[in-house]
C-alpha cells in the first residue's frame, strides 16, 4: 500500500529498548507494554487519530507465528475506530514465517467504518473474517 502519510504503528515496548531504538523512534512507532492494560497508549492513539494521523495496529496483539491464518483479535482496533470515527483498512501479510522471507506478500481490503452504536464483539468478528480472507489471498500470491 503506497501512502504519503506516515503510519504510526503500535509496537511492543521491547523494540524501543533494543539497540534499534533509534529506528523505531524515527519511524514514529508508539511503544506498547503488552503485559498490562495500556489506557495511556490508547489515549495517545485516540488523540492522534482525532488529529488526522494514521495509526497501524496489529489486532492480534502480536505477530502470528502459528499455522492458523489468524489468531483471536484484541479489541483495540475496533474500539478506536468506533470511538473516533476513523476508517479501518484491513491488511494482511503472508510469507514472513519461513527461513527465506523473499516472497512476502500483502493484501489490502476495502476501507470501512464502524457505527457508533455497533456491537464490538460482532465488529471484531467481522474484522477477523476480513483479515483471514485477505491472509489466504496473500498466501496464494506467495505460491506464484
Predicted features along the sequence, with ranges:
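Catalytic core of membrane glycerolipid acyltransferases/transacylases, capturing the structured
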Residues: 1-36
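Short secondary-structure boundary micro-motifs
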Residues: 6, 13-14, 31, 39, ...
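Short acidic-hydrophobic sequence patches enriched in Asp/Glu that either
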Residues: 19, 37, 72-76
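Glycine-rich, highly charged phosphate/nucleotide-binding loops
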Residues: 36-42
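Non-catalytic C-terminal accessory region of glycerolipid acyltransferases
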Residues: 42-144
Amino acid at each position: 500500500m503506497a501512502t504519503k502519510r506516515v503510519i504510526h504503528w503500535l509496537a511492543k515496548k521491547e523494540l524501543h529498548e533494543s539497540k534499534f531504538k533509534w529506528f523505531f523512534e524515527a519511524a514514529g512507532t508508539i511503544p506498547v507494554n503488552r503485559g498490562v492494560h495500556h489506557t495511556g497508549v490508547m489515549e495517545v492513539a485516540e488523540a492522534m487519530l482525532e488529529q488526522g494521523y494514521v495509526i497501524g495496529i496489529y489486532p492480534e496483539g502480536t505477530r502470528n507465528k502459528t499455522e492458523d491464518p489468524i489468531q483471536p483479535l484484541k479489541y483495540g482496533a475496533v474500539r478506536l475506530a468506533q470511538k473516533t470515527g476513523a476508517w479501518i483498512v484491513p491488511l494482511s501479510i503472508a510469507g514472513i514465517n519461513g527461513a527465506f522471507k523473499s516472497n512476502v506478500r500483502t493484501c489490502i481490503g476495502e476501507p470501512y467504518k464502524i457505527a457508533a452504536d455497533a456491537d464490538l464483539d460482532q465488529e471484531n468478528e467481522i474484522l477477523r473474517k476480513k483479515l483471514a480472507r485477505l491472509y489466504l489471498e496473500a498466501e496464494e500470491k506467495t505460491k506464484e
